[in-house]
């Protein structure tokens, strides 16, 4: 009990002379995202099994090799275990779910924040802190977004393993920490800005993957890549570091507690804001890491061909056409190796028969 009271000691978390009852956001609310995680996973499986499978069935060639399977059969197969398989259809359905969620989250975020002063002036995140009220719409926005990242951690146990799996796990953990800690000390306004700015580029990322898999829209792949790359640079490399992080580092302390020094080597309280700023910067380094991957894809695209997946779905995530070509080549080689010895024997046997006929012809007596 003593240790818990020591951990929650107000000066470690809040500005001077502020107590927990005065903070509108309540820590106990962070149990809600944990409770939401399992329902979100169930909703995901149902969404993939119905709307997602219908999209795949009519818009992609994911089921092209299975001529006799029906739409209902595909739905039932995914719902009863296909969601944990490793297949082309599974990878596309993962993209479909993330695209659907990020589209919903971005549009809902715009709706709940369209009249928010801090959307247009980041300083409003700090003016009047920590007494900012939390409207019900913002409350749900925060709870659902946090619950979604918990559901991604659960989903990672049965999703297709991607080449940047561990980077994604770090990203999800940092995001959950940022959302939870920012809610605890009522940094909710800046948290909503981070969520909104990140969701928009994820919409184009997952949308670009879907277009790439869509058999009817192959020519849209490069266009979607340009949209994604533009939104990525605008939100994660410009807005996030130069607007959000810069304001948190240079303006927050002056507007909340003027004598507070963020980079104080003696680490004077409160400590929580320093941890949040550190996590914000760490998240930005992940953005830089992924930017190098994106630039590599952009280079390949500029030298010809379609833009490939920005982040590969697995360590061996080749295009389906390439995988099929390699499989056909392997089967042809295998067939040739089986046929070649018998062919050689037939050729040798034919040559021997010719020699025998010539010898018999020479030995045969001539008729006078």
From Swiss-Prot:
Compartments reported by the entry: Membrane
Residue stretches making up the TLC domain: 90-303
Pathway: Lipid metabolism; sphingolipid metabolism
Keywords, comma-separated and alphabetical: Lipid biosynthesis, Lipid metabolism, Membrane, Sphingolipid metabolism, Transferase, Transmembrane, Transmembrane helix
Membrane topology: Multi-pass membrane protein
Transmembrane segments: 27-47, 92-112, 138-158, 165-185, 191-211, 225-245, 275-295
Name this polypeptide is given: Ceramide synthase hyl-1
Source species: Caenorhabditis elegans
Lineage: Eukaryota, Metazoa, Ecdysozoa, Nematoda, Chromadorea
């Amino acid at each position: 009990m003593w240790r818990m009271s020591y951990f929650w000691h107000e000066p470690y978390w809040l500005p001077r002379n502020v107590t927990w009852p005065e903070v509108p956001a309540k820590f106990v609310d962070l149990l809600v995202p944990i409770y939401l995680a399992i329902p979100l996973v169930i909703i995901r499986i149902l969404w993939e099994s119905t709307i997602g499978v219908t999209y795949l069935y009519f818009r992609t060639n994911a089921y092209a090799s299975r001529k006799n399977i029906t739409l209902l059969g595909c739905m039932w197969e995914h719902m009863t275990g296909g969601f944990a398989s490793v297949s082309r259809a599974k990878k596309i359905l993962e993209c479909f779910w993330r695209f659907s969620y990020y589209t919903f989250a971005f549009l809902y975020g715009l709706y709940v924040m369209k009249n928010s002063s801090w959307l247009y002036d980041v300083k409003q995140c700090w003016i009047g802190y920590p007494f900012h009220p939390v409207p019900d719409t913002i409350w749900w926005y925060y709870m659902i977004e946090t619950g979604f990242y918990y559901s991604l951690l659960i989903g990672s146990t049965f999703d297709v393993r991607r080449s940047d799996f561990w980077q994604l796990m770090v990203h999800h953990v940092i995001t959950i920490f940022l959302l939870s800690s920012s809610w605890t000390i009522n940094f909710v306004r800046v948290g909503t800005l981070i969520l909104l700015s990140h969701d928009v580029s994820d919409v184009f990322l997952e949308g670009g993957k879907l277009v790439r898999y869509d058999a009817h829209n192959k020519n849209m792949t490069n266009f979607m890549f340009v949209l994604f790359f533009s939104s990525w640079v605008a939100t994660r490399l410009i807005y996030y570091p130069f607007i959000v992080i810069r304001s948190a580092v240079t303006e927050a302390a002056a507007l909340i507690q003027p004598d507070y020094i963020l980079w104080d080597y003696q680490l004077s309280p409160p400590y929580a804001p320093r941890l949040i700023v550190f996590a914000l910067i760490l998240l930005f380094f992940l953005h830089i890491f992924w930017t190098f991957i994106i630039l590599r894809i952009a280079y390949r695209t500029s030298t010809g061909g379609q833009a490939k997946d920005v982040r590969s779905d697995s360590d061996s995530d080749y295009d389906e056409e390439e995988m099929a070509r390699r499989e056909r080549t392997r089967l042809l080689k295998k067939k040739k190796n089986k046929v070649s010895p018998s062919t050689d024997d037939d050729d040798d046997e034919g040559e021997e028969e010719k020699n025998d006929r010539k010898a018999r012809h020479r030995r045969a007596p001539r008729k006078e």
